[in-house]
From Swiss-Prot:
It holds the Pfam family eIF-1a. The lineage of its organism: Bacteria, Pseudomonadati, Campylobacterota, Epsilonproteobacteria, Campylobacterales. InterPro entries: NA-bd_OB-fold (IPR012340), RNA-binding_domain_S1_IF1 (IPR006196), S1_domain (IPR003029), TIF_IF1 (IPR004368). It comes from Helicobacter hepaticus (strain ATCC 51449 / 3B1). Its main location: cytoplasm. This is Translation initiation factor IF-1.
Amino acid sequence: MAKDDVIEVDGKVIEALPNATFRVQLENGHIVLCHIAGKMRMHYIKILPGDMVKIELTPYSLDKGRITYRHK
């Protein structure tokens, strides 16, 4: 998958699940299952419920995504 194909959206973490997986509610109300990107995992960036995050969705599966940034 090329970098150009991703869809970037903002959302709010509503639930933390095992194995660095989170349920994120997007701005339009959809709920997506997301995991943390590798760079965030390497740098031990903690994500808690209530945090605003930027996620990437693929055009193939719009119900799973990758968290790439945690807003301050």
